[in-house]
Every structure is written in structure tokens, then in C-alpha cells.
Amino acid sequence: MFNFGNLAELMKQAQSIKENVEKAKEELKNEKIVVEVGGGMVKVVSDGLGTVLDLEIDKSLLNENEYPVLKDLLIAAINEVSERSKEVVADKISQATGLPMNMSKFGGMF
């Protein structure tokens, strides 16, 4: 026989998880991740969701001869800040859902 008490408890837990995930999203929007590459020549700042908020480039890289170096550093910085934001998201989701970090990377929540 079906136990409606268990269903009610499950629905309550689901609502709690949803609220925790929404709170985590807000916290991630306010999180700042800073990455510096090339000895600080390029700096990228993103929020915890991976949106790039700021980019600083050493003026010595802003000449035509340094373009290949600048391009490589920008790619490295953006990729690193993206990877770090994924780690921050996984941690926040793990905290919000109670799931282990490797299980909290399920698709599309953020």
C-alpha cells in the first residue's frame, strides 16, 4: 500500500533542495574567481557561474609583435577561470543537495 506520509516527506525534501540550489545560484553570482597567467601579465575575473566580469592585460603585450603571446595567455586565463568556476559550482551544488561533488555535476542546473 502507498504511504502518503513518505510522499509528503519526499516532496518537502525536494522543495528544500530546490531552495538550497536557488540560494547557491545567488551565492555563485556574487563569488569572484581571479586567475592570473603569464606572471600576472593577463588577469581574468569571473563570477562563480563562469561569466567573465573583468580582464586586465599588461600594456607590454599590446603591440603587434606580442599578439601570439597575448592570444595564448588570454586563452589560458579564460580556460582556467572557466575550470575553476565549474569547481565552485560543483562544490555549491554538493552543499545544496547533499550529494558528493562528483554527483553534483549533473547537466544543466547552472
UniProtKB/Swiss-Prot annotation:
Protein name: Nucleoid-associated protein SYO3AOP1_1366
Pfam family name, one: YbaB_DNA_bd
Subunit and interaction comment: Homodimer.
Keyword terms: Cytoplasm, DNA-binding
Species of origin: Sulfurihydrogenibium sp. (strain YO3AOP1)
Localization (cell): Cytoplasm, Nucleoid
Gene3D superfamilies according to UniProt: Nucleoid-associated protein YbaB-like domain
GO cellular component, as recorded: bacterial nucleoid; cytosol
Keyword tRNA-binding: no
Superkingdom assignment: Bacteria
Lineage: Bacteria, Pseudomonadati, Aquificota, Aquificia, Aquificales
Main localisation: cytoplasm
Molecular function, one GO term: DNA binding
